[in-house]
């Protein structure tokens, strides 16, 4: 992480490691309280942050939604002041997660610099009232203002001189290479793979048309170009006998789609079945309740095997999945 931060900031912009700290679950992440002793906190949960702060001096850190020992991380003086700034020497700005400010004035007092999203005049009025009431001091506000202005000045030149043009084709080629080199072959019964040129293939599975290549939520990006299996078929040298979605992406049973896929499979030498986890399974704000591929996909696999045993499963998932169904495919 330290090397990554150095690489980002070498371009004159700010890196923002997150989420500080003990953000160990997504379910109820805005209300959960991570309760732990000091040794566990420092030796297990904070070690990664300590390394990145001391070795690469990130200009910002993002606080987490959760409470730590009863206090919201974004208002936690022990985390933001005692450990981050005093013990580690962090001099940058602390940024809230999106909507992660519970008490803005208390956050400012205890080390939170920037509230996101921008709350407009509400934050100003809240801070003015807090200063007048004695809840916080002008010195608290000044300290956060110094951090914010330093961030603005340090990144101003890079922002002003930033070119929005880049070599999209080169970036795409690198992404394709990364995808190819990270593919893992788990099984290849009867040496079914690689498929010989001209092999008649039935392409089945919603993911063949709309691939899963990233998570959902705030991590999702709008790509300039995305390669789908169907879109790249001309490069394969294989004969496609047809495509069928085969299953509902969100896991609902669909007998008609399954029947269409089974009929198509009977026309092919090999079935290429694209399975995986959908966007709902892999999004922020929740934790998976199991490690299973949706049951409608497994039911489809079993139905296809009855009419064509030569099945290659292409499994797309951003996390581990159980594969008790692997005996129903050859590769």
Regions found by a protein language model. Name each.
Residues 1-331:
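Glycoside hydrolase catalytic-domain context in secreted enzymes
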């Amino acid at each position: 992480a330290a090397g990554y931060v150095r690489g980002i900031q070498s371009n004159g912009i700010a890196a923002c490691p997150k989420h500080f700290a003990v953000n160990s679950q997504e379910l109820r992440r805005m209300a959960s309280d991570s309760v732990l002793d000091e040794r566990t906190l420092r030796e297990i949960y904070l070690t990664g942050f300590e390394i990145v702060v001391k070795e690469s001096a990130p200009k910002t850190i993002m606080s987490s939604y959760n409470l730590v020992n009863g206090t919201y991380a974004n208002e936690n003086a022990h985390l933001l002041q005692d450990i981050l700034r005093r013990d580690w020497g962090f001099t940058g700005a602390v940024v809230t997660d999106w909507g992660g400010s519970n008490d803005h004035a208390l956050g400012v007092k205890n080390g939170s610099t920037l509230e996101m999203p921008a709350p407009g005049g509400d934050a100003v009025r809240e801070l003015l009232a807090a200063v007048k009431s004695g809840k916080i001091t002008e010195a608290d506000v000044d300290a956060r203002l110094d951090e914010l202005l330093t961030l603005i000045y340090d990144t101003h030149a890079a922002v002003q001189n930033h070119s929005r043009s880049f070599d999209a084709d080169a970036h795409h080629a690198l992404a394709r290479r990364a995808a190819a080199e990270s593919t893992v072959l788990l099984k290849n019964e009867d040496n079914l793979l690689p498929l010989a040129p001209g092999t008649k293939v039935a392409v089945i599975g919603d993911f063949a048309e709309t691939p899963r290549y990233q998570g959902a939520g705030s991590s999702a990006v709008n790509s300039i170009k995305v390669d789908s299996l169907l879109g790249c078929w001309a490069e394969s040298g294989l004969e496609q006998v047809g495509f069928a979605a085969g299953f509902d992406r969100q896991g609902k049973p669909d007998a008609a789609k399954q029947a269409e896929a089974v009929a198509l499979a009977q026309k092919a030498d090999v079935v290429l079945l694209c399975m995986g986890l959908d966007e709902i399974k892999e999004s922020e704000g929740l934790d998976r309740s199991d490690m299973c591929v949706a049951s409608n996909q497994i039911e489809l696999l079993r139905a296809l095997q009855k009419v064509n045993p030569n099945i290659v499963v292409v499994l797309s998932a951003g996390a581990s999945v159980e594969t008790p169904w692997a005996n129903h495919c050859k590769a």
